């Protein structure tokens, strides 16, 4: 009987870990949905904190790991996080009240700073999704 309980325990831990991960992903999706929805809403400081927290929960301290790799301004960190969760560049431009070209150039420059290689905005996106 004890052997059976020991065999079940790892499965139970896996199930609990899966549940924790699922909850974290649901939380992130809920937070990100606001950022993806172009309407009259503009994120406040608490919304950005909520976004960072949810991303870090799902993506193994993403913001901390990224900031340890390279210095980022507040705007650059926000663009990196929005890119990580696949918010469209047009929506990012709308959130920052700037042009799509401005966002594309920022993404390109960030890729070059982070990797030390010449690149493009789409290369930045791919790098963010893998990091």
Predicted region positions:
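Membrane-proximal linker segments that couple transmembrane helices to downstream signaling/catalytic modules
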Residues: 1-75
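Cytosolic nucleotide-binding catalytic cores of signal-transduction proteins
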Residues: 42-131
């Amino acid at each position: 009987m004890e052997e059976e309980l020991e065999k079940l325990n790892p499965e139970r831990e896996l199930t609990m870990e899966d549940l924790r991960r699922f909850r974290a992903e649901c939380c992130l999706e809920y937070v990100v949905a606001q950022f993806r929805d172009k309407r009259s809403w503009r994120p406040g400081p608490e919304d950005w904190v909520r976004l960072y927290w949810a991303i870090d929960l799902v993506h193994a301290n993403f913001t901390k790991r990224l900031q340890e790799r390279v210095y980022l301004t507040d705007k650059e960190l926000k663009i990196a996080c929005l890119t990580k969760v696949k918010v469209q560049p047009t929506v990012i431009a709308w959130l920052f009240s700037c042009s799509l070209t401005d966002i594309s150039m920022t993404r390109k420059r960030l890729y070059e700073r982070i990797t030390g290689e010449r690149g493009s905005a789409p290369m930045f996106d791919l790098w963010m999704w893998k990091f």
